Amino acid sequence: MKTSRLPIAIQQAVMRRLWEKLAQANLKLGRNYPEPKLSYTQRGTSAGTAWLESYEIRLNPVLLLENSEAFIEEVVPHELAHLLVWKHFGRVAPHGKEWKWMMESVLGVPARRTHQFELQSVRRNTFPYRCKCQEHQLTVRRHNRVVRGEAVYRCVHCGEQLTAK
């Protein structure tokens, strides 16, 4: 499913969640942070990104369509938290203690750094790599970094260096 045409009902649900969490944050923080710009232009395997300087949230329309409920519940507050942390604290670690606090204490959402959505429809070419416990699929970018000797990747489970299959 490569379409970026989103049903209006899904766009409205995204906006409701954004407004709800922004109002909640403004109330708890005693601030009046503005509504960020929202676009559906994120591509690839990222569910969303927060652009600090332009105060914008970019969401992946394909992943949103395929995972609407979980996406709206998790990704929208996740990206909003990045913008609120930037407004409230300035430049800090992207998923540091300030972001975790904003997610859990202010927005009331579990602080997860990554999504668990199925990526088959948005994944492009991948390259098989192995460790001692499983097979991994590296993106073209990561594969090229390995080939050029710029990066080494390790399995998060066993810690072994990944090798091309």
Curated annotation (Swiss-Prot):
GO CC annotations on file: cytoplasm
Domain SprT-like: 22-163
Binding site for Zn(2+): H78, H82
Domain of life from the UniProt record: Bacteria
Subcellular location: Cytoplasm
Cofactor(s) demanded: Zn(2+)
Cofactor note text: Binds 1 zinc ion.
Gene Ontology MF term list: zinc ion binding
Record keywords: Cytoplasm, Metal-binding, Zinc
Active-site residues, as the UniProt record annotates them: E79
SMART domains linked to this entry: SprT
An annotated GO BP: response to stress
Family designation: Belongs to the SprT family.
HAMAP family: SprT
Record NCBIfam families: PRK04860.1
Descriptive protein name: Protein SprT
